Amino acid sequence: MMEMIQIWAKILEPVLIHFIAINIVQMMGLHADAAFLTTMAAVMVLPFFCYMMKKDGCFQKKRKTLAIGKAVEIALLGIGANAVCSILLNLINSRAGFSNDAQEALFGSSFAVQLVGIGIVVPIMEEVLFRGLVYNRLKAYNNEWWSMILAAGIFAVYHGNPLQILFAFPMGLLLLAVYEKEGTLMGPIVLHMAVNISSILFTAAGSL
């Protein structure tokens, strides 16, 4: 029992660090802008997460590169997946009436902060956190498929509300599939950026 607790403590350690960082930034009252606060928390924890990946031995493995053509394919996949998921979630939300206040707060921030923070910085941090650390630590104790399900579940639940969980779980599986296929975090980072940036652009276009 104690060994299991220690295993899960190690797996979820980076998630707890990010949770603490978010609360520290909020308590500091640096800015009321939700996207700015989220970005600041990401900037705070990213160096620690990179150090943790290095300590885990992730950087000792042979690193694969991502060709430009492949990056474009992955970005288009992300845009398409985001469009499909958004349509389905809008249909679900129109019937179930789930609250999506957190997402609306992020998209209510200034366009520049959204684009740089939510579109670039946060995807990098979340991929290092959820795919680089949580998933790889899960794989040390479980088979690949079970690790993917657990990692996607943790990624989804961490997003907080029912509507985002419905979006984040399949997206988490897709990000992991790209990670496994490409053998580099650059794959899911590009996909995640494409998803977030396309969401920002679609939302901005819809508000015109």
Task: Please give the residue ranges for each predicted region.
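Active-site His/Glu-centered metal-binding helix of metallohydrolases
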Residues: 124-129, 133-134, 161, 194, ...
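Membrane-interface starts of transmembrane alpha-helices
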Residues: 30-41, 109-114, 143-151, 184-187
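Functionally important transmembrane alpha-helices
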Residues: 19-27, 152, 157, 163-208
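N-terminal, membrane-interfacial amphipathic/helix-forming hydrophobic leader that caps
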Residues: 1-71, 76, 80-84, 90, ...
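Juxtamembrane helix-loop-helix connectors linking adjacent transmembrane helices
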Residues: 58-122, 140
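Membrane-embedded alpha-helical segments of multi-pass membrane proteins
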Residues: 39-45, 116, 166-174
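Hydrophobic alpha-helical transmembrane segments
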Residues: 8-12, 71-76, 112-116, 145-150, ...
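Membrane-interface helix/loop boundary segments of multi-pass membrane proteins
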Residues: 17, 128-150, 177-184
